Amino acid sequence: MAAAPRACKGHGRPLPVLLLLLLLALPPLGGPPGAAAYFPEERWSPESPLQAPRVLIALLARNAAHALPATLGALERLRHPRERTALWVATDHNADNTSAVLREWLVAVKGLYHSVEWRPSEEPRSYPDEEGPKHWSDSRYEHVMKLRQAALKSARDMWADYILFVDADNLILNPDTLTLLIAENKTVVAPMLDSRAAYSNFWCGMTSQGYYKRTPAYIPIRKRERRGCFAVPMVHSTFLIDLRKAASRNLAFYPPHPDYTWSFDDIIVFAFSCKQAEVQMYVCNKEVYGFLPVPLRSHSTLQDEAESFMHVQLEVMVKHPPSEPSRFISVPTKTPDKMGFDEVFMINLKRRQDRRERMLRALEEQEIACRLVEAVDGKAMNTSQVEALGIQMLPGYRDPYHGRPLTKGELGCFLSHYNIWKEVVDRGLQKSLVFEDDLRFEIFFKRRLMNLMQDVEREGLDWDLIYVGRKRMQVEHPEKAVPRVRNLVEADYSYWTLAYVISLQGARKLLAARPLSKMLPVDEFLPVMFDKHPVSEYKAHFSPRDLRAFSVEPLLIYPTHYTGDDGYVSDTETSVVWNNEHVKTDWDRAKSQKMREQQALSREAKNSDVLQSPLDSAARDEL
């Protein structure tokens, strides 16, 4: 009997047929297992992902019309599905139009979010036991605690997974903040918010009576020298509660716990509630999440509060994009002015568009009108152009830190200021304000400078130049305070020309010195002209040296960056030698001394005799 032919020998094709059947039974390439099968009844669809958690955002606002456009705009940009987000908003005791702003926004967005609960109260406009709108009386504390408790109850009643509390002046600029906090899987967790000073929305220590306690752990966390999520005794202002956690059922804002004996303060009452429920609070500083203002004193005004929040927006722009307002709110039109000066100049290199845009926005926020002056780009000047202007370096000049001659960048900087002095004289401008473009403003800048100039005029002070921002180089003894004028001292040897006020008389004196024929950096030239430069050889080339120079104290302007900071760029120090474009001067920026932060002054050298204004104390950091 003949044997059947073997398939492997090619006699017949049973193997390919079997392979084909097997391939048909397999799911499509890249498809999930079981998504396809030989028999229709064996096919099934993959499971869909989980829906985003349900979140209720609770916002309490009082006298916050100035902050709400930016705060609400930031909330709109949170990357969490709006259909899974509910809004709970309350406002009362307002002396401004907070209710109208919130109503306009809620009407516009109510169809975008899962639900909206709106709790306005138009009357009364103040608490009976408060001394002013910034004073926290017992009745105000109690009312806020009741509102937070009501928001918490609403979240529980709607079976929300989380509740996010946000103060009306807190800017959550990181759109992933909510997602990142949820991922931490903590019962109570806060994003660390930045401010202009050491203040933030957490404590690292608490006394036995429930008050704030300084600890060595605070500053490393606040400065992000240590990064992570840290167990702390207190978080406030902006924080997330995970309502899925069993322990969250024992948390309450009001009434205070039966064992509570500490100060009647809403944040301390809630911290005690967490402690009694054995719920640990956490603060996370892994990323930059947002910003908040430093609290003002109880006697501060609504104007102080509005300007304080505006300063938060200015601080944001130093290293981040500006905080844009909600597109659903009508923002009041700004009316810039020149602060009483004949002209406000802002110097900017054309190729530094980022600085120009930031400074123009910062001035607009403060309602300061300026004239943009295109800076002289020293790096773009060739030797023949320098010679055509009759420029010669001061004989014997060497940079005090590197021993190098003048750079093209320093030459361009000098010419930029020189051209402004010429314009001041040509136009007969009695007093002008000059800004460079790499500066940051102190809080209440506009009001404090205007008050200072009013004092100067009232006293009839004979002045030529007033530093608004500088680096004080003479640190052995204090500078002389000006009698009867607040916040002003006679300037000693100083660096930097970040911002200054110049008079017509002062500009004439600077031009009369014919500085182009014996040039040195502009911030070395000015101390020579008011006879405070420590190098007598430099001073010998200029006479008279009778510039009447003063300085604001405390300063109202500081640099945006110092040597070694991320983003530090120098257009003056990193350049080429003034008369030879082939000799580079790109020094090690990390070792540059000129742009280092002002060194700490000894107690004996501080300008402690200067007359202070009320705004100075309001501007101090609470910590």
From Swiss-Prot:
Transmembrane domains' residue ranges: none
PTM (free text): N-glycosylated.
Comp. bias intervals (Basic and acidic residues): 589-607
Keyword field contains Transferase: yes
GO term, biological process aspect, one: positive regulation of collagen fibril organization
Record's catalysed reaction(s): (5R)-5-hydroxy-L-lysyl-[collagen] + UDP-alpha-D-galactose = (5R)-5-O-(beta-D-galactosyl)-5-hydroxy-L-lysyl-[collagen] + UDP + H(+)
Glycosylation sites recorded in the entry for this protein: N97, N185, N382
Source superkingdom: Eukaryota
EC class name: transferase
EC code(s) of this entry: 2.4.1.50
Signal peptide stretch: 1-30
Alphabetical list of Pfam families matching this protein: Glyco_tranf_2_4 (PF13704), Glyco_transf_25 (PF01755)
Keywords in alphabetical order: Endoplasmic reticulum, Glycoprotein, Glycosyltransferase, Signal, Transferase
Motif mapping: Prevents secretion from ER: 620-623
Cellular component, GO, one term: endoplasmic reticulum lumen
Gene3D superfamilies on file: Spore Coat Polysaccharide Biosynthesis Protein SpsA, Chain A
Disordered: region residues: 589-623
Subcellular location: Endoplasmic reticulum lumen
Gene Ontology MF, one: procollagen galactosyltransferase activity
PANTHER family, per database record: PROCOLLAGEN GALACTOSYLTRANSFERASE 1, PROCOLLAGEN-LYSINE,2-OXOGLUTARATE 5-DIOXYGENASE/GLYCOSYLTRANSFERASE 25 FAMILY MEMBER
Family statement: Belongs to the glycosyltransferase 25 family.
Stated role: Beta-galactosyltransferase that transfers beta-galactose to hydroxylysine residues of type I collagen. By acting on collagen glycosylation, facilitates the formation of collagen triple helix. Also involved in the biosynthesis of collagen type IV.
Protein name according to UniProt: Procollagen galactosyltransferase 1
Organism this protein belongs to: Bos taurus (Bovine)
